From Swiss-Prot:
It comes from Escherichia coli. The lineage of its organism: Bacteria, Pseudomonadati, Pseudomonadota, Gammaproteobacteria, Enterobacterales. The biological activity of the toxin is produced by the A chain, which activates intracellular adenyl cyclase. GO terms for cellular component: extracellular space. This is Heat-labile enterotoxin A chain. InterPro entries: Enterotoxin_A.
Length: 258
């Protein structure tokens, strides 16, 4: 057992300890609470339903956070890490007041953006190796979790019985090109006049002209992000319906053969 533990923490200490189709998030909430919430939802999700506050789905605002370093109250993204090690370091920093917390293992999907790839040199915290999930992470997308007690990660990965591999199999995070127009830089930010963002600037951003409706740069970014999120959600729903229909067809075929 000592040898197994030793090997586990050697792997944990390596920056390469990452799975290409898995992401990680440290969170103080236990799995049953996450399940009741429907998954790992952005803070702005609750604000929207409780107070009618519009979610801010601006990646640059999300990455910067607030001036005090905390998550924005209207944030429309959920932060994850590329590696277990990065998530553990984040947990030890922001959850140091908890004797027990969890690191959730999450399947990748196209509503997720590598912050450093999208924001490039303007990424405010590049060392965090963050991948942000637009609109949150459903419970069915959570592969499992590790329990962390007094800073030590439990060796056992607890599998989520409600994880649906067939929904997320072969899905990857969004390519950086999909995220450039959703970057969310302020209207006059120099990034909109530089490569690669200059070719993806929404109307009203940088040197791009205003929209016909007169929307500002921020409003246009919000609109584009909303459209992107809805298209992704529709894709997942179609996949769920397709799988359900396939199961019904199989059931009917077996019934007819009996």
């Amino acid at each position: 057992m000592k040898n197994i533990t030793f090997i586990f923490f050697i792997l944990l200490a390596s920056p390469l300890y990452a799975n290409g189709d898995r992401l990680y998030r440290a969170d103080s909430r236990p799995p049953d609470e996450i399940k009741r919430s429907g998954g790992l939802m952005p803070r702005g999700h609750n604000e929207y339903f409780d107070r009618g506050t519009q979610m801010n789905i601006n990646l640059y605002d999300h990455a910067r956070g607030t001036q005090t370093g905390f998550v924005r109250y209207d944030d429309g993204y959920v932060s994850t890490s590329l590696s277990l090690r990065s998530a553990h370091l984040a947990g030890q920093s922001i959850l140091s007041g908890y004797s027990t917390y969890y690191i959730y293992v999450i399947a990748t999907a196209p509503n997720m953006f590598n912050v450093n790839d999208v924001l490039g040199v303007y990424s405010p915290h590049p060392y965090e190796q963050e991948v942000s999930a637009l609109g949150g992470i459903p419970y069915s997308q959570i592969y499992g979790w590790y329990r962390v007690n007094f800073g030590v990660i439990d060796e056992r990965l607890h599998r989520n019985r409600e994880y649906r591999d067939r929904y997320y199999r072969n899905l990857n995070i969004a390519p950086a090109e999909d995220g450039y127009r959703l970057a969310g830089f302020p209207p006059d930010h120099q990034a909109w006049r530089e490569e690669p963002w200059i070719h993806h600037a929404p109307q009203g951003c940088g040197n791009s002209s205003r929209t016909i409706t007169g929307d500002t740069c921020n409003e246009e970014t919000q609109n584009l992000s909303t459209i992107y999120l809805r298209e992704y959600q529709s894709k997942v729903k179609r996949q769920i319906f397709s799988d359900y229909q396939s199961e019904v067809d199989i059931y009917n075929r077996i019934r007819d053969e009996l």
